[in-house]
Amino acid sequence: MQYKEYGSTNAKTIVFLHGGGLSWWNYREEAEMLKNEYHIIVPILDGHAGSDKPFSTIESNARDIISFIREYLNGSVFMLCGLSLGGQIALEMLSQQGDICQHAIIESAVVISSGITNVLISPAFRLSYPLVKQRWFAKMQFRQLRLKAELFEDYYRDTAAVQKNDMIAFLKAS
């Protein structure tokens, strides 16, 4: 797993976990604002543009981040923040190691998956995957996410770079 890092390693650490189809850049502004007071870590979740391996499971992402925290951050952090897929990974981390953080912020994490959704994702996404690489379609998706306009180029570049099987895997997981 790849990591982006901001601030001093001597400060309290905050870990930000991005949502599916997003990446570290989704937290760039927050990291810049907080880096003078906190040590910020933003993993690039598996299967996303810039990652070093395909997406497998929420559990394996959680294990990898826990291992990183054990090895480099003395086993726990001040705060763990997760959005959507990142929120699910954060919840899994907390279930594997309850003392991984002092505080947690979880946003829009699915805790009970829909069986019918999981069945439909693969065939529907296989048909619509070529659209992901189209700029006009990416703009429509981007508007639905309500992200800041200046993040569009990052979003489009990274979404277009995600492999079909990775996209299906993390859509099914979340």
Language-model segments: residues:
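Conserved HGGG/HGGXW glycine-rich cap/lid loop of the alpha/beta-hydrolase fold
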Residues: 5-52
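Structural signature of beta-strand start/N-cap positions in the alpha/beta core
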Residues: 13, 39, 77-79, 102-103
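Active-site signature of alpha/beta-hydrolase-fold catalytic machinery across serine-
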Residues: 29, 92-96
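Active-site loop/oxyanion-hole signature of alpha/beta-hydrolase fold enzymes
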Residues: 29, 41-81
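Nucleotide-sugar donor-binding loop of glycosyltransferases
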Residues: 44, 84, 108-110
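Gly/Ala-rich beta-loop-alpha elbow adjacent to hydrolase catalytic centers
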Residues: 82-86, 90
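Flexible "cap/lid" loop of the alpha/beta hydrolase fold
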Residues: 95-96, 101-131
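Conserved alpha/beta-hydrolase catalytic His-Asp/Glu region
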Residues: 115-117, 132-174
